[in-house]
Amino acid sequence: MSAMEALILQLHEIGAVKFGNFKLKSGIFSPVYIDLRLIVSYPSLLTQISQTLISSLPPSATFDVVCGVPYTALPIATVVSVSNGIPMLMRRKEIKDYGTSKAIEGIFEKDQTCLIIEDLVTSGASVLETAAPLRAVGLKVSDAVVLIDRQQGGRENLAENGIKLHSMIMLTDMVRVLKEKGKIEVEVEVNLLKFLEENRRVSVPSVEKPKPKPRVLGFKERSELSKNPTGKKLFDIMLKKETNLCLAADVGTAAELLDIADKVGPEICLLKTHVDILPDFTPDFGSKLRAIADKHKFLIFEDRKFADIGNTVTMQYEGGIFKILEWADIINAHVISGPGIVDGLKLKGMPRGRGLLLLAEMSSAGNLATGDYTAAAVKIADAHSDFVMGFISVNPASWKCGYVYPSMIHATPGVQMVKGGDALGQQYNTPHSVITERGSDIIIVGRGIIKAENPAETAHEYRVQGWNAYLEKCSQ
């Protein structure tokens, strides 16, 4: 008895091959149903299938990574990967609207070749559904290997889409072996052969092609689209200085803040302050910081997070001991109180050419600025695009409401060289992840710079990482 015959008998013995009248995914009724989900409960059989699949491939089928079609082929692909030391990718059948929102998970490089692994092929639709997102991320797909080919047009349909199908077992061979070994009657074989003759080519349901990614606009083009003067100015500064780094200057005193602003000023496009934490604040603080900002050509962003009704925030913005309106180019606000907060801030800020960032998301664990709240912030920004210049955001690429206009700037807090978090719930992401994967524009870095032994050198490192990520995003 050959190894293939033994495998067919094992599949029949565990109940993976059933005869009767079954409706298939394609909609047609079949006298045979093959349920390979059962093999996960038989480790030795799963290992045997995985080893035979790879060994049956011709030398011409070269590949760098493997990807199993969800879901039954995933354990087969996993064993292939582990047994042969071949990197594996996973295709998400349902793309999540949180996290990275990726269709393909795993580590790979553009132009690598991916072998698709499938358990059963009828029309080839499931293989094509997996090939599409793999190709969309820059992988090459030229071969697929399958345990059982039902011989109903899958091979031809895949060939028309540039994929060569390699099959371990043909359905006609399976039925022949089962008849010869006395597992089924002659009538069953005749019935099946007649069915295959009448259903030689099952059409492939239309596979929705992934929408092409919109071209990433550079800061120069986006500056021309911005309706806010401070937004335009920030885009221009980022271009001229080649930096998308914002320093979160959360230090203990005004003296420290002015000192570090002067040290890292050449590396940043934006300096973020929390003026109400400075015990030595004096009325001339704003003019001193303004002089440093003008010297090093960066903008000042007071992270006040206004949240009250329109009339109150107007007074908070213009008055009090801090007089934020006098020296801060940019402020930010929550939208919890509704659009009236923007009206109030706009009343004072617009005549001075100031800009507003809306808090669409936050970087702290368990925060409530998600989903509908984020969508509401986008809607308010759209209605006030002459004053609202962008957002404080964490993962704008995943927003359900869709990516907002390129005229809007996204600034993301919680950035460090290494992913992680702190004891108070702050979540950190890397510059590359924030810019290329999460769709942001500006990295906001605090403790990673101000706690460094040499803040200026460290700021330069962040600047290089952030800017290189921006250039990479523009080249995609």
Curated annotation (Swiss-Prot):
<dbReference type="GO" id="GO:0004588">
    <property type="term" value="F:orotate phosphoribosyltransferase activity"/>
</dbReference>
<comment type="pathway">
    <text>Pyrimidine metabolism; UMP biosynthesis via de novo pathway; UMP from orotate: step 2/2.</text>
</comment>
<keyword id="KW-0456">Lyase</keyword>
<dbReference type="InterPro" id="IPR014732">
    <property type="entry name" value="OMPdecase"/>
</dbReference>
<keyword id="KW-0328">Glycosyltransferase</keyword>
<dbReference type="InterPro" id="IPR001754">
    <property type="entry name" value="OMPdeCOase_dom"/>
</dbReference>
<comment type="similarity">
    <text>In the N-terminal section; belongs to the purine/pyrimidine phosphoribosyltransferase family.</text>
</comment>
<comment type="similarity">
    <text>In the C-terminal section; belongs to the OMP decarboxylase family.</text>
</comment>
<keyword id="KW-0210">Decarboxylase</keyword>
<dbReference type="InterPro" id="IPR029057">
    <property type="entry name" value="PRTase-like"/>
</dbReference>
<dbReference type="Pfam" id="PF00156">
    <property type="entry name" value="Pribosyltran"/>
</dbReference>
<dbReference type="GO" id="GO:0044205">
    <property type="term" value="P:'de novo' UMP biosynthetic process"/>
</dbReference>
<dbReference type="InterPro" id="IPR004467">
    <property type="entry name" value="Or_phspho_trans_dom"/>
</dbReference>
<dbReference type="InterPro" id="IPR000836">
    <property type="entry name" value="PRibTrfase_dom"/>
</dbReference>
<keyword id="KW-0511">Multifunctional enzyme</keyword>
<protein>
    <recommendedName>
        <fullName>Uridine 5'-monophosphate synthase</fullName>
        <ecNumber>2.4.2.10</ecNumber>
        <ecNumber>4.1.1.23</ecNumber>
    </recommendedName>
</protein>
<dbReference type="InterPro" id="IPR023031">
    <property type="entry name" value="OPRT"/>
</dbReference>
<dbReference type="InterPro" id="IPR011060">
    <property type="entry name" value="RibuloseP-bd_barrel"/>
</dbReference>
<dbReference type="InterPro" id="IPR018089">
    <property type="entry name" value="OMPdecase_AS"/>
</dbReference>
<dbReference type="Pfam" id="PF00215">
    <property type="entry name" value="OMPdecase"/>
</dbReference>
<dbReference type="GO" id="GO:0006207">
    <property type="term" value="P:'de novo' pyrimidine nucleobase biosynthetic process"/>
</dbReference>
<comment type="pathway">
    <text>Pyrimidine metabolism; UMP biosynthesis via de novo pathway; UMP from orotate: step 1/2.</text>
</comment>
<dbReference type="InterPro" id="IPR013785">
    <property type="entry name" value="Aldolase_TIM"/>
</dbReference>
<keyword id="KW-0665">Pyrimidine biosynthesis</keyword>
<keyword id="KW-0808">Transferase</keyword>
<dbReference type="GO" id="GO:0004590">
    <property type="term" value="F:orotidine-5'-phosphate decarboxylase activity"/>
</dbReference>
<feature type="active site">
    <location>
        <position position="305"/>
    </location>
</feature>
<dbReference type="GO" id="GO:0016036">
    <property type="term" value="P:cellular response to phosphate starvation"/>
</dbReference>
